[in-house]
């Protein structure tokens, strides 16, 4: 029950709603029945999941499975400073864009990667289908401008 969850975690979570279509304005396509929940802070998320520093430093199997969630959490925290992020998933398909933001009269898709694995099939298909002016992939890789998107190192996410 979402309302019970809200009462229990009021002030501790961010809710990121899906949009039914990647069109302007994003808010008018918001689907409040489909959403992702994030902690308000990456440290709080780690504490809620009993993630200790040894797990992060040593990179054991638990962290290998969890670092994608931590990376998405970090990116959301940075985006929330300037934007209202949404996400988008294609109905009945495996295509999902981690975050969509509306800025400068356009929609910007953002794909989040935890490592340097730079496959971004969903992002590439989104760009082909929707022709945004800007598309970002965030990762541990260096800044790189490609023909169809920009790779932003995770430390540069605040400038998006």
Where are these regions (language model features)?
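C-terminal tail/extension regions appended to the core domain(s) of diverse proteins
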Residues: 151-160
């Amino acid at each position: 029950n979402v309302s019970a969850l809200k009462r229990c975690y009021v002030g501790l979570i961010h809710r990121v709603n899906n949009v039914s279509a990647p069109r302007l304005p994003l808010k008018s396509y918001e689907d409040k029945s489909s959403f992702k929940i994030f902690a308000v802070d990456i440290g709080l998320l780690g504490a809620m999941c009993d993630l200790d520093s040894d797990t992060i430093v040593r990179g054991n199997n638990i962290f290998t499975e969890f670092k994608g969630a931590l990376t998405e959490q970090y990116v959301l925290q940075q985006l929330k400073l300037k934007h209202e992020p949404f996400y988008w998933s294609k109905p009945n398909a495996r295509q999902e864009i981690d975050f969509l933001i509306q800025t400068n009269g356009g929609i910007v898709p953002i794909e989040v990667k935890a490592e340097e694995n730079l496959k971004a099939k969903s992002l590439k298909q989104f760009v082909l289908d929707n022709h945004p002016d800007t598309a970002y992939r965030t990762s541990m890789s260096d800044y790189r401008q490609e023909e169809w998107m920009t790779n932003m190192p995770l430390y540069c996410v605040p400038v998006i």
